[in-house]
Structure formats: structure tokens, C-alpha cells
Amino acid sequence: MNLMAKTYFTSDHEWLRVEGGIATVGITDYAQEQLGDLVFVELPETGKKLTKGDTAVVVESVKAASDVYAPVDGEITEANGTLSSDPSLVNSAATGAGWLWKMRLADESQLAGLMDEAAYKAHIA
């Protein structure tokens, strides 16, 4: 993990690590624990434009299918293709190698509405 990048969290249990106007997005450890073992991840297409709240990814576990929402406006620059063959990486490394997508931020001021790690920990307590 790059310590220079700032990490933000949403009330929907997503994390964003922002560096140079690009956000890497995934689900939190709390979210993956609630979902259980993931068996499929439907990844977004590169170039897709998202508005905050849009469904970006669908994750399926042995328990349920869940939408993962765009935490901010932006454009998909990369999807984590490794998850197509190994969705369990989200379970084993949710905040690292199990990231879901990267996006170019359309409006960095939207980050102000997200939580820092301390606020997120209080949210799930």
C-alpha cells in the first residue's frame, strides 16, 4: 500500500485510495466478512462513466449477490481482471490485491463527503 495515498471510506463499505486524481476502489474487510466467500465478480468496462451511487460492480458470494456502488463521479480506467479467475482474492486481501476498479475522479471535492478510517471504524462499531 502506498502510504502517500489517502484512503477514504463510504457508509456502503467501500474504500477509495486516491493518488494523482485516480481512485482505486474496493470493498472493506467488514463488507467481505458480511458477504462470505465470493464466487463471482462482475467487473466494469474500462471507459465507463459513473455517477456517484451508480452500480459499478456486482459481487456474488455463497450467501447473496450485492451491488458495489460508485462512491464518487468518474470514469473507469482499469478493472482488476485477476478477480475474474480468482474472486476469493477480495476475501483474502480486500484492501490490497482484491481491489475492484480504478477510476479517474471527475470532482475531487466529492471526497470531502466521505469518511476517514476513524469515522468508518465508528460507523461499523
UniProtKB/Swiss-Prot annotation:
GO cellular component, one term: cytosol
Pfam families (UniProt xref): GCV_H
Cofactor note: Binds 1 lipoyl cofactor covalently.
InterPro entries named in the record: 2-oxoA_DH_lipoyl-BS (IPR003016), Biotin_lipoyl (IPR000089), GCV_H (IPR002930), GCV_H/Fam206 (IPR033753), GCV_H_sub (IPR017453), Single_hybrid_motif (IPR011053)
Keywords: Lipoyl
Modified residues (N6-lipoyllysine): K63
Signal peptide: none
TM helices/strands, residue ranges: none
Cofactor names: (R)-lipoate
Highest taxon, organism lineage: Bacteria
GO biological process, one term: glycine decarboxylation via glycine cleavage system
Span of domain Lipoyl-binding: 22-104
Function: The glycine cleavage system catalyzes the degradation of glycine. The H protein shuttles the methylamine group of glycine from the P protein to the T protein.
Record text on subunit structure and interactions: The glycine cleavage system is composed of four proteins: P, T, L and H.
Similarity-based family: Belongs to the GcvH family.
Protein name as catalogued: Glycine cleavage system H protein
Gene designation per UniProt: gcvH
